[in-house]
Amino acid sequence: MEEEDARGYNKPCPQCSEVNWAISDEGTFYCKSCHTVIEKTREVDDTEVFSTHGKLQSISRGLRKKRKLEKGWEWYVCEGFQFILIKQAEALQALGVAPQIKDEILCTFWRRYLQKTNQAYVKRPVYRSVLTCRDSDSSATEVDSDLEAFSIGTSSVSDGYTSDASGRLSLPTEDIPSASESAVSVHSGSVDGLSHVKMRKNFKPWNYVKMTMPMTLAFCYLALLWLRASITLSDLLRFVFEKHIPYINAHQYLPEEIKVYGHDVRIFRMQALPVYNDILSKAYELGAFLDLPQFPPITKNCYLHPSVLCMKYLIEANLPDELQQWTCQVAEKTGIDDFHRLTFDPACKRASHIRYDVQAVALIILVLKLLFALDDNTEWQLSKFAERMNQSNKEKTVFDLQSWYQTVRQCYEKAQQKLEEEYGRFMWKSDCPLYYSQTTKSLLQKRKQMSENLQRQFSKLAGAAPNTGKQGPSSFLFKWEEQNTDTISFHGHSLQAVLHQGKKPPTPINTHYWLNSLRKCKTRICQHSELYEESNFPRSYHFMVCLFAFLLRVEHCVIHHEVGLIEELFFQEKKNKRKQKPKKQEMTDFREVPPD
């Protein structure tokens, strides 16, 4: 066949001058006498190419077999959450939290949760209808160093559960079906993924707290609260958004042997950022479910105490340091600084939720209302008076609220715009995409490759700067410096323009105060704590609420509602003192609220 195809070429060989050609397997011509290869190749008809290609495709389709389901470990959902909790604890350690948070605090909480939900440390789990046993020979050779430090099965536990070399749970061998009878669900990578998704909250006979991704943050917050660490709940959620703590796409931290697909996607995939009140409610619910003892007391030296947090947010908001003594007085009069009130006790179910950071900024706003009124009139008159004092006396700078407003507003608007851009560029998809079934895996991989190519091309066209990685974590969002005229520091400014200097103790010049709510709402169905209308309040007050809501990354209604609660305590205390004191004696601390 090769000789017949080469008969049409009659040119002599340039090496030996003979005409004795043949065609190689690659389609090139060579001389059979001297084996010289020339550049000429075989000419192929188009119809022959298409017919041959079609035959190859049909043959390949006929011989192709269905790809078997990728199998790894036979794992449970609680094991996946255990890996994620390990990574979150390590991230908190990297942020400066004490090492006890991983091996002692968080580990103890997790063990107690597994025992309470009958998933471990019990003889017979009540919810697993089908138990599977892993091949101990294959798993014993692989040692996971991460799980060794956080093993939930120890030799001290004698209830039928142990831990193998890889750190995973090893179930008791009695009443477990053989490997041939193992029934791992084809709809999920985990053994109990389907049952975990369909499980209701008050499913009998448990009445348990269902484990979810937001619940992992509740575990972390309880551990931070137990250690009295210098990380508030708002800081924790901000670190989650900045990806310093694994939460979004946390499944990529799982080992390769743990296959996540099907119903597992609904468990470990998060499409929204955590909400402040939601995580706080889950933390209180978790603490009551675990029957935890009373947490260590929050004393004046603790970071979560109002005096410390108020000073922190005064620095953050670029407000004068002299406001600190006023916030301490209000906290003392309302009883907010009492350690009995600040300490978390899971056994006290009727106690209100303690929002340490929100409570601190609400104290600052209340003090600003006492000194400046924040009614769109009084504060600007006081600012003009402070401006005249600064012109006449340049030795000590007096705090000017109008100048502060112009400086802080400019920085706030820039930071707000930057945050909105970060929200728009936030990457929800991970490098390890999740898929619901094996049939959609190839399709999702093609879509991912196409989106990456398009994103790369658009970034080249737009001339965008390459991503340099995430910035280092910081407790402060703003940096106020005296050298930069755009960010003037107001920390050392005096409050002489708003106080009567002749009296001891000094009292505010402002004698008016307006309340956020005229009447206390006693119903729980109106949801007044979730309502906040900007048009109903002065613009200066609204700016204060927006500023501190931005610093804490919470909704405006959360700040506004907390201010109303502290106002209720403050003026109720003043009302009680007014009844006890004689009529002729005047109040020397704060002015009374004018009667209606």
From Swiss-Prot:
What's a single GO CC term here? RNA polymerase I core factor complex
Biological process GO annotation list?
A: RNA polymerase I preinitiation complex assembly
In this chain, the stretch annotated as Disordered covers 575-596
Q: Where in the cell is it found?
A: Nucleus, Nucleolus
Zinc fingers, RRN7-type, are found at 4-39
Instruction: Using the UniProt annotation, give all residue ranges assigned to the region (N-terminal cyclin fold).
Output: 75-263
According to the record, the residues making up region (B-linker) are 70-74
The GO molecular function terms of this record are: RNA polymerase I core promoter sequence-specific DNA binding; zinc ion binding
Q: Which UniProt keywords apply?
A: DNA-binding, Metal-binding, Nucleus, Transcription, Transcription regulation, Zinc, Zinc-finger
Outline the segment boundaries, as ranges, of region: C-terminal cyclin fold.
Answer: 264-374
Q: Where does Zn(2+) bind?
A: 13, 16, 31, 34
Organism domain of life: Eukaryota
Comp. bias (Basic and acidic residues): 583-596
B-reader: region residues: 40-69
The record's listing under PANTHER family reads:
TATA BOX-BINDING PROTEIN-ASSOCIATED FACTOR RNA POLYMERASE I SUBUNIT B
What does the similarity note say? Belongs to the RRN7/TAF1B family.
Its biological purpose is as follows: Component of RNA polymerase I core factor complex that acts as a GTF2B/TFIIB-like factor and plays a key role in multiple steps during transcription initiation such as pre-initiation complex (PIC) assembly and postpolymerase recruitment events in polymerase I (Pol I) transcription. Binds rDNA promoters and plays a role in Pol I recruitment.
Q: Domain annotation text?
A: Although it shares weak sequence similarity with GTF2B/TFIIB, displays a similar subdomain organization as GTF2B/TFIIB, with a N-terminal zinc finger, a connecting region (composed of B-reader and B-linker regions), followed by 2 cyclin folds. The RRN7-type zinc finger plays an essential postrecruitment role in Pol I transcription at a step preceding synthesis of the first 40 nucleotides.
Name of this protein: TATA box-binding protein-associated factor RNA polymerase I subunit B
What gene does the UniProt entry assign to this protein?
A: taf1b
